[in-house]
């Protein structure tokens, strides 16, 4: 049995979890509402303040989706209570970020500023060279952070570019030069 899948999910006060007949799990909380369709190989049982995920059978697919489904539901519960965030840092001369309403405007050395609209439910916080992406959906927060990082990935010689705050860039030595 999946070690992750068999752990029950604690549902905090102020959060409601509903499952309909099509295995669509809906979680409502103070930071919003999230829905996820769960595979038919697993079932979702709500027992008071806990949610348990069980397998229908012991097939290879059911075992594979058991832990995944439990993690997806647990992330939804965490998202509507605490939310998720990713922090990006910009290194480079003239690299800057500003907010224009809800839109993120990035100056990344191109001939034009790059405008990034937030995904549904996400929001941006900006310091001079730091961008924080916040939202209840872990997948959307991570996806938006990856797409922003992709605009100017960090390069190994000078370290210029956009990187995650906890990412370590492996630096390379420059040319050896003539002697």
From Swiss-Prot:
One of the record's GO cellular component terms: cytosolic large ribosomal subunit
Classification via Pfam families: Ribosomal_L6 (PF00347)
Keywords: Ribonucleoprotein, Ribosomal protein, RNA-binding, rRNA-binding
Ribosomal protein in keyword set: yes
Domain of life, per lineage: Bacteria
Any GO BP annotation: cytoplasmic translation
GO molecular function, one term: structural constituent of ribosome
Statement: the UniProt record of this protein carries the keyword Acetylation: no
Gene3D superfamilies for this protein: Ribosomal protein L6, alpha-beta domain (3.90.930.12)
Coiled coil: none
Family: Belongs to the universal ribosomal protein uL6 family.
Function comment: This protein binds to the 23S rRNA, and is important in its secondary structure. It is located near the subunit interface in the base of the L7/L12 stalk, and near the tRNA binding site of the peptidyltransferase center.
Record's subunit section: Part of the 50S ribosomal subunit.
Name recorded for this polypeptide: Large ribosomal subunit protein uL6
Chain's gene name: rplF
């Amino acid at each position: 049995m999946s070690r992750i899948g068999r752990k029950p999910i604690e549902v905090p006060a102020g959060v409601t979890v509903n499952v309909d007949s099509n295995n669509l799990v809906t979680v409502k909380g103070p930071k919003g509402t999230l829905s996820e369709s769960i595979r038919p190989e697993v079932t979702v049982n709500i027992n008071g303040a806990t949610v348990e995920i069980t397998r229908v059978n012991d097939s290879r697919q059911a075992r594979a989706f058991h832990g995944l489904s439990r993690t997806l539901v647990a992330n939804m519960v965490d998202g509507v209570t605490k939310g998720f965030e990713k922090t990006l840092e910009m290194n480079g001369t003239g690299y800057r970020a500003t907010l224009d309403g809800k839109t993120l405007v990035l100056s990344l050395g191109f001939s034009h500023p790059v405008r990034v609209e937030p995904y549904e439910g996400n929001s941006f916080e900006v310091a001079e060279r730091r961008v924080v992406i916040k939202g209840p959906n872990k997948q959307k927060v991570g996806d938006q952070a990856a797409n922003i990082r992709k605009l100017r990935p960090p390069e190994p010689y000078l370290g210029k570019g956009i990187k995650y705050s906890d990412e370590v860039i492996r630096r390379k030595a420059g040319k050896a030069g003539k002697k």
